Amino acid sequence: IMQPIDLPLNQKNIIITRSKDGIFDVKKIFINKGANIYDLPALSVGYPDNINPLDEALNEINDFHWIIFSSSNGIKFVDKRLRYLNSSLKECSRKIKIAVVGEKTAKTLDEYGIKADFIPPEFIAESLIDNFPISGYGLKVFLPRVQSGGRNLIADEFRNAGSRVVEVAAYETRCPESIPKETIDAILNQKVDAMIFSSGKTVSNSAFLLEKELGREWLTFLNQTKLLTIGPQTSKVCHDIFGRVDSQAQKYTFEGLL
């Protein structure tokens, strides 16, 4: 009789907090290692409240020297809006250089048939600034970003270097209404081995939803649950809200937790 393979995460119960449309690919990573996955969709992603500033920037997109994407959502919503305006990101990429922060962001760009002109060695904003291939002086830089909650570090640093930076909201992340019942049941029964956060917003939205579902004592249900984060900014928010971080990915990706 064949013995079952003892996988690294065999039968571990893990909650993944992600946007609703981004959870599937991440689940596969952990399911392939033997884990049982519970969904906690902590973000829903859509256009910003006001689309006009994005349209104005996209109508002048060929005037920019560089576009800097710090998230996959930025790529998706810029391309989606360009197509509405009878263009595409791939078409624009023939004339403009593109830099990305993050391995997943670079992978998303690849899926659109576009090769990034610059990817920093580490998947954080500071690495992009420290290793950017040319001086920022005189550059016109387009920074599509989340409407609320993102960092201004890249924009500030390029402005300080003498760039003209156009920073506009390309998308907004909002908090969903509720948590799936099976996930709540697993938390109530204290069956969750680990909970994974990939951004500050997934931390704050998860906390909001957990308190809404479980009441003021919500944190006590996670006493036996390891809190895992991807990246230093996520860890900071997790410390502030949950009071601890049990492990941070060495490489700032989901795979970096394995």
Residue positions per predicted region:
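Signature of uroporphyrinogen-III synthase
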Residues: M2-L258
